UniProtKB/Swiss-Prot annotation:
A Pfam family that the UniProt record links to this protein: NDK
EC numbers: 2.7.4.6
Function (record text): Major role in the synthesis of nucleoside triphosphates other than ATP. The ATP gamma phosphate is transferred to the NDP beta phosphate via a ping-pong mechanism, using a phosphorylated active-site intermediate.
Organism per entry: Staphylococcus saprophyticus subsp. saprophyticus (strain ATCC 15305 / DSM 20229 / NCIMB 8711 / NCTC 7292 / S-41)
Protein name per UniProt: Nucleoside diphosphate kinase
Positions of the catalytic residues: 115 (pros-phosphohistidine intermediate)
Subcellular location(s) per record: Cytoplasm
Keyword Nucleotide-binding: yes
């Protein structure tokens, strides 16, 4: 099964949306295999967003992501990266489809609720950056036979 990294950002944590977001992800068939509630250290934020270093929003992004706790998680399922990206919606909430997390709950592009890996390669990199191997669980759910052929 494929895994992907998701991070519920400070704006969603402050708005008490963690449960709502996880519920939507699980209802779509993705299984939570790791999670942690944490304040992001500056060094981790900088490494995670290293590809944006030269962009004008970089300093604001680092400041925002380290300003309050996040809920970092790893989910697993068939085509997990694609499924999660579909549930999340477009980066800008005003362009996101209603029914997606950002379409329903996001406020602005700078307060867009959640981060999700954009490829299998990014997912693997981000999972290894945020989680140690022993922080992730391997288990079966009874519903799996109902979800996957």
């Amino acid at each position: 099964m494929e895994r992907t990294f998701l991070m519920i950002k400070p704006d969603a944590v402050q708005r008490n949306l963690i449960g709502e977001i996880i519920s939507r992800i699980e209802r779509k068939g993705l299984k939570l295999v790791g999670g942690k509630f944490m304040t992001v250290p500056q060094s981790l934020a900088e490494e995670h967003y290293a590809e944006h270093t030269d962009k004008p929003f970089y300093k604001h992004l680092i400041s925002f992501i380290t300003s309050a706790p996040v809920f970092a998680m790893v989910v697993e399922g068939e085509d997990a990266v694609h499924v999660a990206r579909h549930i999340i919606g477009k980066t800008n909430p005003s362009e996101a489809t209603p029914g997606t997390i950002r379409g329903d709950l996001g406020l602005t592009v700078g307060r867009n609720i959640i981060h999700g890996s954009d490829s299998v390669e990014s997912a693997n990199k981000e999972i290894n950056l945020w989680f140690k191997a022993d922080e992730l669980s391997e288990y079966s759910e009874s519903r799996e036979s109902w979800l996957y052929e």
